[in-house]
Regions:
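A cross-domain feature marking catalytic cores of carbohydrate-active enzymes
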Residues: 14-16, 80, 100-104, 127-130, ...
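Alpha-helical packing segments of well-folded alpha/beta enzyme cores
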Residues: 60-67, 71, 113, 143, ...
Length: 285
């Protein structure tokens, strides 16, 4: 069996093409000229074919739904911040899954906001970008711990960027080895990595073997570049740990992703888990 075409994919990373000002938080800490003054998208040097022409669309929700329908995506996880996302969640609760971007630097304000969004939207996940904060916050920093504890209390996962970040900002706060401390201190936490874990994918696999709650999502990687360690792990002992995530419209088009996906060498029994079942379980859908 090849990649199934009618499974009802769950995409755990989708955004809306609302404007390039959403990247200003990265420009604030970058020091190179291209990131601060030239690039519309801070990782243009990596993503040459980003669908930038979609940004500024009159109806960004309609644009995203159209693309989801084209490629068989039944549901997509989005942030619950901002008017566009909140409209999408209200108008299409059967298509969009609410998550919240958290910032440990905001302390108890974000803990209270997590509870508010859980009660208002039925929050299904928290998301974090350690290298994107100002100041940056290491994955195992004590400032993160109240957020991890609240995720355990609400019984929701947290999706966290790990590995060398794409933007030209410092990387130390996202080293994969830091995840070990978190999983040790929060054995009940469901922790899903984002953005590759490179160059430490072999370590990520070892940690997933060690910690039941640790998972890996494929966000920000075109399928032709999925790490070999991750594909091999999915095909052996990790079929329940690897979760599909795209990067539309931030850096990748769904057309590119779904044109390349059939060439990923997953075994037959891995595809349904990768494209749908693992996300449904982790997000309690």
């Amino acid at each position: 069996m090849s990649m199934p075409l009618d499974i009802g994919v769950i995409d755990t990373m989708v955004g809306f093409p609302v404007g390039f000002e959403i990247y200003d938080f990265i420009r604030k800490q970058a020091k190179d000229w291209d990131t601060r003054e030239t690039f519309q998208f801070p990782v243009e040097y990596l993503f040459k074919g980003a669908p930038k022409d979609l940004f500024g669309a009159d109806d960004p929700v309609a644009v995203v739904l159209h693309e989801m329908d084209r490629f068989g995506i039944e549901r997509a996880m989005i942030g619950c911040e901002g008017d566009v996302s909140q409209h999408a969640l209200a108008a299409h609760p059967d298509r969009f899954i609410p998550s919240m971007s958290v910032d440990p630097n905001r302390g108890m304000d974000d803990i209270r906001k997590m509870v508010e969004n859980y009660e208002r939207f039925g929050l299904k996940a928290a998301t974090a970008f350690p290298a994107g904060y100002v100041p940056q916050v290491p994955i195992n920093d004590r400032r993160f711990y109240p957020i991890y504890a609240k995720c355990c209390e609400l019984d929701i996962p947290i999706f966290v960027c790990a590995g060398v970040p794409g933007p030209r900002i410092k990387m130390a706060c996202q080293q994969v080895e830091l995840i070990d401390d978190v999983m040790y201190d929060f054995p009940d936490l469901t922790f899903v990595t984002r953005h590759g874990c490179e160059p430490w994918t072999d370590l990520a696999v070892k940690l997933m073997l060690k910690w039941p709650g640790l998972h890996y999502s494929t966000s920000a990687f075109a399928p032709k570049y999925y790490p070999r360690d991750i594909i091999d792990y999915a095909n052996t002992r990790g079929a329940d740990k690897i979760i599909y995530a795209g990067y539309f419209p931030m850096g990748l088009s769904l057309e590119r992703i779904f044109n390349e996906l059939p060439n990923v060498g997953f075994k037959d029994d891995v595809w349904p888990k990768f494209l749908r079942e693992n996300a449904a379980r982790v997000l309690k859908l």
